């Protein structure tokens, strides 16, 4: 049996599909595709699948992936890609299908590009002069304060037409995961930049030794 990684982009209207609904979408698409994916056993068999790192509602991504299994001996992955894209909902595009090379638990960081309207650049630049950026990370059990400057010491601003954007990489491991929305919320509270004006795009995952996860 082969474990297969389906890598896809998730943008525009698809960014508002929740994880639970995304699981349903993938189950439905894989069933309709007729591809030889493996189903779990038992009274309620369903397609085996695991997602690497859930994406928050409203955020876009160029690097999402879901792992499935197949008992096919020589899968035609180009045909898999074509079959899936033919029936994917708008905003979801499969860009690669191949056997799993790295296990999902190797992910240590998630990298993003956060964009604002270009006139926000002078305000964003003020972040770099701050000595401390404490934010509250909430979980089901507790709330703790995290020093964001440890992970985002400065914003490296780039202009792109009517937008200004900056790249960041945040922890995304089993030990600690930080959502970029924490930074966006801080920028709104501290500098008055509306969170609704920010566009968050996940660009890649990194391992602990900063290799690109694939």
Predicted regions and their residues:
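Short, charge-patterned binding micro-sites
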Residues: 38-68, 101-103
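Hydrophobic, proline/glycine-rich low-complexity stretches
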Residues: 1-8, 14
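Ordered, amphipathic secondary-structure segments that act as subunit-interaction surfaces
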Residues: 61-113
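N-terminal ordered "arm"
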Residues: 14-39
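Core RNA-modification/binding signature centered on pseudouridine synthases
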Residues: 132-214
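Short amphipathic alpha-helices in soluble, non-transmembrane regions
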Residues: 78-88, 123-131, 182-184
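Short beta-strand-to-loop capping motifs
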Residues: 8-10, 68-74, 114-119, 168-172
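Short, low-order "capping/linker" segments at domain edges
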Residues: 104-119, 153-154, 207-214
